[in-house]
């Protein structure tokens, strides 16, 4: 029975040693986590002071302005397309007039006077 008691005592001593080691590791981890959390909170506060966030009303105003600018840009693109097509049509018309003028001049030069 002495051997069994010694074995029981050694096992309990080992369990206590492991528990102490585990508790120490946990305490160090919690301490490190707390330290990093505080550091991150300080950094976040520094960033919040450095970069002010816009409130919802201001963000909505910016979004509305962006939508308005997009709409105006689309209208402008439509107008540019219209004027490009008009330019091509006028160019074609001008070429037709040139051809008709040449043909008419030839016709007039052939007719006896």
Curated annotation (Swiss-Prot):
Assembly description: Component of the biogenesis of lysosome-related organelles complex-1 (BLOC-1) composed of at least BLI1, BLS1, CNL1, KXD1, SNN1 and VAB2.
Cellular localisation: Endosome
Family to which the UniProt record says this protein belongs: Belongs to the BLI1 family.
GO biological process terms held by the UniProt record: endosome organization; regulation of protein localization
Coiled-coil zones: 57-97
Pfam family, one: BLI1
Record's protein name: Biogenesis of lysosome-related organelles complex 1 subunit BLI1
Note: Present with 1240 molecules/cell in log phase SD medium.
Role noted for this protein: Component of the biogenesis of lysosome-related organelles complex-1 (BLOC-1) involved in endosomal cargo sorting.
GO terms for cellular component: BLOC-1 complex; endosome
Assigned keywords, A-Z: Coiled coil, Endosome, Transport
Organism listed in the record: Saccharomyces cerevisiae (strain ATCC 204508 / S288c)
């Amino acid at each position: 029975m002495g051997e069994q008691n010694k074995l029981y005592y050694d096992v309990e001593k080992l369990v206590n040693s492991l528990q102490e080691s585990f508790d120490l590791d946990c305490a160090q981890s919690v301490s490190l986590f707390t330290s990093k959390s505080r550091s991150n909170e300080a950094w976040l506060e520094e960033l919040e002071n450095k970069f002010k966030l816009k409130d919802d009303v201001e963000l909505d105003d910016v979004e509305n302005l962006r939508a308005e600018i997009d709409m105006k840009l689309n209208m402008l693109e439509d107008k540019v397309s219209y004027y490009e097509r008009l330019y091509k049509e006028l160019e074609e018309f001008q070429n037709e007039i040139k051809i008709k003028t040449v043909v008419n001049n030839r016709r007039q030069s052939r007719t006896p006077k």
